[in-house]
Amino acid sequence: MYADDFDGEIEIDEVDSLVEFLSRRPAFDANNFVLTFEESGFPQLNIFAKNDIAVVYYMDIGENFVSKGNSASGGTEKFYENKLGGEVDLSKDCVVSKEQMIEAAKQFFATKQRPEQLTWSEL
């Protein structure tokens, strides 16, 4: 698996390394992860993580989904797309826990498909 974050790209070949990678928060107690297997970049998981929460996007050719969290409070949550402080405001309705994000990434690592344990909204 190719894994990219605030610090650059690495290759990951075992699930324990993936879990360790997903715990990295090099700036603002946050990170933006891109996980893929192909040079083309698809399918991919794109994860905005901050503290113990995340928003997960699944993208493949012709289909895009975003995680659906348990909050119906509306509003937005600030995440970061880089170490320079580039901010991204994402809907609180899409926020899932760190544990849910890790389980989704582990399933993606194993299957190369959209993780089934998250609820998704099609974009």
Curated annotation (Swiss-Prot):
| Mutant lacking the gene: phenotype | A double dddA-dddI deletion has a 100-fold growth disadvantage compared to wild-type in competition experiments.
The protein's superkingdom reads Bacteria
InterPro entries recorded for this chain? DddI
TM ranges are: none
Q: What does this protein do?
A: Immunity protein component of a toxin-immunity protein module, which functions as a cellular contact-dependent growth inhibition (CDI) system. CDI modules allow bacteria to communicate with and inhibit the growth of closely related neighboring bacteria in a contact-dependent fashion. Bacteria that have this module inhibit or kill bacteria without it, giving them a growth advantage. Specifically inhibits the toxic activity of cognate toxin DddA (C-terminal 163 residue fragment) upon expression in E.coli.
Subunit details: The toxic domain forms a 1:1 complex with the DddI immunity protein. This protein blocks the active site of the toxin.
The protein here is known as Double-stranded DNA deaminase immunity protein
Record organism: Burkholderia cenocepacia (strain H111)
